[in-house]
């Protein structure tokens, strides 16, 4: 089962007050409900592929309204042959839709969320919970990117969901998709806040555990990569220094170098694996700092490069014995 499915399953077990149940139901029906007419009856079908969600919608309707309710199961024949669960209402439909602020007399569908319906903070949470159950999704925190979204067919309703989420400072944004619109979150912290808002505590804890472990792994990897890069840089510098010193030795001899450069050159080729700090401690003329050693080695690099380019020892500032 996906992380999103586990999250929704957890939400279907929540105990809520009648007033919050009504708001949750309103969000779900607005987004997943369909109206048809037969023999002067208004029939409402609420459809989902999630059995737990179907049971919850059935139970909420049953608890709130004393009307006959059917629960049907259909088999999808295309692509994934999943079951489709339909909660069907054949009587009292118009009155229920008006009570849920989805319909206005005589038969006009409202396009957005009734502000009075979500005045209380708990009602706002309930509406977002219903919307997420209807058409929400959230990436597994172990995947490459954090992403939570709620899909809506109608732009005005999508904007209302975004505004509702941002009353909780979630920094939600909207985006047009091929067949509708989405309100989405990309920040891990905002996703955990949203899970807390809708009451998905277990999902929140799992998300946070995975996120913390993932962030720790990323930090360790960055540290290792940084240390590896520094180590490679140090090794490459040491190899270059030794090659340059050996070139000076084979062309003009180390004796041609000034004393302070001659001593460090001899120590470097005799101790290829030691650090600059350790080289500084080996000098018989007195301990020199790491930066001081690095400065002398850079001077040796410059001398070697100038000799390679064709300059004479005298031009480089070296004294070569004629004997």
Curated annotation (Swiss-Prot):
It comes from Listeria innocua serovar 6a (strain ATCC BAA-680 / CLIP 11262). GO terms for biological process: cell division; regulation of sporulation. Keywords: Cell cycle, Cell division, DNA-binding. It holds the Pfam family HTH_WhiA. The keyword Glycoprotein does not apply. Residues 275-309 bind DNA. The lineage of its organism: Bacteria, Bacillati, Bacillota, Bacilli, Bacillales. GO terms for molecular function: DNA binding. Belongs to the WhiA family. This is Probable cell division protein WhiA. Involved in cell division and chromosome segregation.
């Amino acid at each position: 089962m996906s992380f999103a499915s586990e999250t929704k399953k957890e939400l279907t077990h929540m105990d809520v007050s009648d007033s919050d149940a009504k708001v949750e139901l309103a969000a779900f029906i607005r987004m997943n409900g369909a109206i048809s007419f037969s023999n002067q009856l208004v029939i409402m079908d609420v459809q989902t592929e999630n059995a737990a969600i179907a049971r919850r919608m059935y139970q909420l309707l049953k608890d709130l309204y004393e009307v006959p309710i059917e629960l049907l199961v259909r088999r999808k024949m295309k692509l994934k042959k999943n079951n489709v669960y339909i909660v069907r209402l054949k009587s009292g439909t118009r009155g229920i839709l008006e009570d849920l602020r989805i319909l206005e007399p005589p038969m006009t569908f409202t396009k957005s969320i009734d502000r009075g319906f979500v005045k209380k903070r708990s009602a706002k949470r309930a509406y977002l919970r219903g919307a997420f159950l209807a058409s929400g999704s959230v990436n597994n925190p172990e995947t490459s990117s954090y992403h939570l979204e709620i899909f809506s067919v109608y732009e005005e309703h999508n904007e209302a969901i975004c505004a509702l989420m941002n009353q909780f400072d979630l920094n939600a944004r909207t985006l047009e998709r091929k067949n509708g619109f989405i309100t989405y979150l990309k920040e891990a912290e905002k996703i955990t806040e949203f899970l807390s808002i809708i009451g998905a505590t277990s999902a929140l804890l799992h998300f946070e555990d995975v996120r913390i472990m993932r962030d720790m792994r990323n930090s360790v990897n960055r540290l290792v990569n940084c240390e590896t890069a520094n180590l490679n840089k140090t090794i490459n510098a040491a190899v270059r220094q030794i090659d340059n010193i050996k070139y000076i030795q084979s062309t003009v001899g180390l004796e041609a170098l000034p004393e302070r450069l001659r001593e460090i050159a001899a120590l470097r080729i005799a101790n290829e694996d030691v650090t600059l700090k350790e080289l500084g401690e080996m000098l018989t003329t007195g301990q020199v700092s790491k930066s001081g050693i690095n400065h002398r080695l850079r001077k040796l690099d410059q001398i070697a490069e100038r000799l390679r380019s064709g300059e004479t020892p005298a031009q480089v500032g070296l004294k070569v014995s004629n004997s």
